[in-house]
UniProtKB/Swiss-Prot annotation:
It comes from the Bacteria. Pfam families: RRF. GO terms for biological process: cytoplasmic translational termination. GO terms for molecular function: ribosomal large subunit binding. Responsible for the release of ribosomes from messenger RNA at the termination of protein biosynthesis. May increase the efficiency of translation by recycling ribosomes from one round of translation to another. Signal peptide: none annotated. InterPro entries: Ribosome_recyc_fac, Ribosome_recyc_fac_dom, RRF_sf. It is found in: Cytoplasm. Keywords: Cytoplasm, Protein biosynthesis. GO terms for cellular component: cytosol. This is Ribosome-recycling factor. Belongs to the RRF family.
Length: 186
């Protein structure tokens, strides 16, 4: 493996870690309605579990409501059950094939819990980044040991790997800070 491929692989892995963080943060509830809240909801449909988005269309008519338009009338009760089981703190109100989910305002205590959870997600992502850095540095040591790169080049590349890790770590910090502001805004 050459050094360019190594750097590219490290960057791809770090991008993937950031995408995972982004997905986790989208699932955190802010005071606003967002269809992303329902990403984790699965529904018992036609003998198997399916994501909610495959049995209904989701929309947000206003900042405090999510509408779930179920396509098959026989699925309405399964969708309600799936939303309830997901334990999102949402109470479904059914009107024919339309399920309305009013989003209650977050309490101060719940906001603080969500901020803690966001920080935990951020810390988990930073741990992933450090593990990726460690793997990259081990690969560099192996390349040096196999006389593919010189000691000076190894040192220079290690610094580049560290800089890459620092850059991604600061991206994590800014994503967490932004989510914290979203959550704490009443």
């Amino acid at each position: 493996m050459d050094t360019e491929t190594l750097k590219k692989n490290l960057q791809e892995k770090m991008d993937k870690a950031l995408k995972v963080l982004d997905h986790e943060l989208k699932g955190l509830r802010t005071g606003r309605a967002s269809v992303n809240l329902l990403d984790s909801v699965t529904v018992e449909a036609y003998g198997s579990k399916m994501p909610l988005s495959q049995v209904a269309s989701l929309s947000t008519p206003d900042a405090r409501t999510i509408n779930v338009q179920v396509w098959d009338k026989s699925m309405v009760s399964s969708v309600e059950k799936g939303i309830t089981i997901a334990n999102l703190g949402l109470t479904p109100a059914t009107d024919g094939q339309l399920i309305r989910l009013p989003i209650p305002a977050l309490t101060e205590e719940r906001r603080k819990e969500l901020v803690k959870l966001a920080h935990k997600y951020g810390e988990d992502t930073k741990i992933s980044l450090r593990n990726i850095r460690r793997d990259g540095n081990e690969e560099l040591k192996k390349l040096e040991k196999d006389n593919i790169i010189a000691k000076d080049e190894h040192h220079s590349l290690s610094e580049q790997v560290q800089k890459l890790t620092d850059d991604y770590s600061s991206k994590v910090d800014s994503a967490i800070k932004q989510k914290e502001q979203e959550i704490m805004t009443v």
